[in-house]
Amino acid sequence: MLRTLAVSALLLAPAAAVAQSPAPHVQDAWVRLPAVSGRPAGGFFLIHGTAKADALVGVTSPRAERIEMHSMVNEGGIMKMRAEQSFAVPAKGALTFAPGGNHLMIFGLSPDVKPGGTIPLTFSFQSGAKVTLNAEARAANAPVKAPEPAAHQH
């Protein structure tokens, strides 16, 4: 019996270590509401990586039908959106989602979300870590504020 418990503890220890890995830090999350009702909203944020590389594999919200992650690529001088399954979060580095670059496309956003309100977003990482925070909802014509990477404290 004691031997079985000891073996079980040894087998479960790596899983517990993975589950307790620190999550990347997400900050400056905001959502640009669509100018036309029924169109997708855009989502933007800054992620700071931990000591180990990770990957953002999805974002969800109870206030949206679905959320896609997109990159912008230059194909023959024409900028095109491309849906992505994941984005690398470098160890001790940063991943930025900003207007004109990487961004979220938020489909079926709840119509009661108004400028000045918030939208809960859950960020899922390849490591199994999840980070939930409230993103500020901004009007389609609101000025863009750049994220401040220097403001992050390790």
Indicate where each model-derived feature is located.
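Bacterial N-terminal signal peptides that target proteins for export
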Residues: 1-9
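N-terminal signal peptide c-region/cleavage motif recognized by signal peptidases
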Residues: 12-16
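Compact, glycine-rich, soluble single-domain proteins
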Residues: 21-154
